[in-house]
Amino acid sequence: MSALLSADDLNDFISPGIACIKPTVTENRSQEASEYGEVEIQIDENGKPLEISKIDGATKNLSPAQISLADCLACSGCITSAEEILVAQHSHNELIKALKEKKTNNKIFVASISHQARASLATAYYMKVSDIDRLLVDLLVNQMGFTYVVGTGLGRKLSLINESQSVIERKEHGFQGPILSSICPGWVLYAEKTHPHVLSRISDTKSPQQITGCLLKSLTAHQLEVERDQIYHLSIMPCFDKKLESARPEQDPSLVSNDVDCVLTPKELVTLLDECKDKFSLTFDALSHSSGSLTDLYQSCAPANWPYVELSWSSDSGSSSGGYGYNYLQLLQSHLCLRDPQQYQPQNFRLESVAGRNKDIYELRLVYNDNQVASSAIVNGFRNIQNLVRKLKPTSSTTTTKTNPLVARRKARLSSKRSESGAQDVQQADASKCDYVEIMACPNGCINGGGQINSPTDEDQKLWVSKTLTRYGSIPMVDLSSDSSLTLELMAWCREFCINYNVPESRLLKTWFHEVEQPTDQAAILVGSKW
C-alpha cells in the first residue's frame, strides 16, 4: 500500500481481498465481428494487446479492463475498498492534473472543507483553527486558482435537521428498535456487504459532504451561468472512505454530474504541499498580510448567493463526528415543546449520559420529570459496531440460544462478588435498545479519521488526538437547539433552494442503500475470500 494510505493508518482496518473479483464486461460488437471475421489476440513490441483479423490482418488496439470506485461499491469481494482505486481516482496527483488541464477545459474549481480536517491541519501546524482557515483560503484561492471555498457547516446543519426529523417521524409511526446513522461510509459499506439485515434500520439522510457538494455546484452554476459538469468540486475530509461515498450512484439522475469530484484528506494535502514546494505552500506570510475579519474572509471566498456564510464555518454541540446523537435529542425536545406546550416545559428536561463498556460507546438519555422520553447512543470503532450488529441480528423463534458455559460462570462470579460487597448494578449503555445510534467506523469518531495527520514520532498519538479535539472544540458553535427560529429558517431556505434551482429535495437530502450480493463464481470466491 502507498505511504499515504496503509492499514496502519486505519483503525480496525479489515484488509481487502488479495485480488479484485469483478468480472470483465464484454461489449456486444456483432457488427464489428462480422467485418473482422475470426480474430486472434497478440501482444505488440510495446507489450500492448492487439486484436488481429484473420481475414485481412487488420489490427485494433484493445482497451484495458478498468475498475472504478462505483465498481468497488457494487462488489462484495472486499469489505473495504481497494487502495489502488482510491489513489488512482481521488488523489492529490489527480487534483494537480486537473489544475493543469484547467487552461484547456475551462473548469471552475470550488472547494469545501470539513471541521475535522481544519482541526487536524491546525494541530499539525501548531496554530489556531481561525489561522489555518486563512491559510487554506490563501492556498486554494490565491495559489491554486479556486473560485470559491466554503465550510461544510451549512450542509451539516441541513443533515442534522433532516436526520432528526426522519427519526422522529419513523418513531411516531411505530418503528421498533434503533435507527442507525448513515453518515459514515465505512460503516455503511460494511453493512451493505456483510450485514444486509440492518439496512432497513439505516437512515437515508445524506452526509454534510454530499449535501454541501450539491448546494455548492448548483449555486455556482447558477451564479456563473455554466453547466454543473463544468464545475470541479474538491472536498477536504478526515476519512479515506469519503472518496467512495462521493462515487455512490444517485437514485435521481436529474443532475448530470457528481456532487463531489475529488476527496482529499489532510494527510494527502500535506503530501501535495511537500511535493509541490515550488508552487504551493501554507505560507505564514499570508497571516501577516491578512487584514480584516474572518467574516469578511468567509464572505469573500463564497458564492454571492451562498446563504448563512458564517454558519458554514461554525460547529455543532455533541460528538466530534457532527453531534448526530446529541442533536436528535435536542431537536426532539424542541419538537415536543412545540407540539404540546401544555404537557412539556423546556426547564423540566435534562440530558443524562451513561457510559458503555469502553470509551467508544456511550448513551444519551432525554429525561422529563425523571421519566425517560428518548435515548441515543454513540458507537465508534468496528469492534463496537460488530457487537451492535450481532445484537440486532434477527433470531428464529424456534431456536434456543446456547450460553457459553465460561461466560455464564463469569457472570455468576461477578454477580456473587457484587452481592457480597452490597454494591448495586451499575447501568451500562446498550445501543441496541436506544431509539437512534450515531455510528462511526473509527475509534474516537471522525476526529480520529484515517486521513487525519498522525502525531510526530516523539509524541503520543492519544495526546495528539486530544489536542486535535481541543482545536475542534474551539470552532465557534451555533446550536440548532438554542434557536428554534434558525431551524425553521434553514428548512424554509432549503425548500426554496430546491424550487428555485430545480433540485428535488430527495436528490439534495436523501441517499439509498442496497445489499451487495455475494459472488457465486467459485473461482471468484476462492480469490476474494482470502483475508
Swiss-Prot record:
Keyword Kinase listed: no
Query: Which InterPro entries does this chain map to?
Result: Cytosolic_Fe-S_CAF, Fe_hydrogenase, Fe_hydrogenase_lsu_C
Entry keyword set? 4Fe-4S, Iron, Iron-sulfur, Metal-binding
Annotated positions binding [4Fe-4S] cluster 2: 184, 239, 442, 446
One GO molecular function term of this record is:
4 iron, 4 sulfur cluster binding
Q: Please cite one Gene Ontology biological process associated with this protein.
A: iron-sulfur cluster assembly
What the protein does comes down to: Component of the cytosolic Fe/S protein assembly machinery. Required for maturation of extramitochondrial Fe/S proteins. May play a role in the transfer of pre-assembled Fe/S clusters to target apoproteins.
Q: What is this protein called?
A: Cytosolic Fe-S cluster assembly factor NAR1
Tell me which species this is from: Meyerozyma guilliermondii (strain ATCC 6260 / CBS 566 / DSM 6381 / JCM 1539 / NBRC 10279 / NRRL Y-324) (Yeast)
The organism that produces this protein has a lineage beginning with: Eukaryota, Fungi, Dikarya, Ascomycota, Saccharomycotina
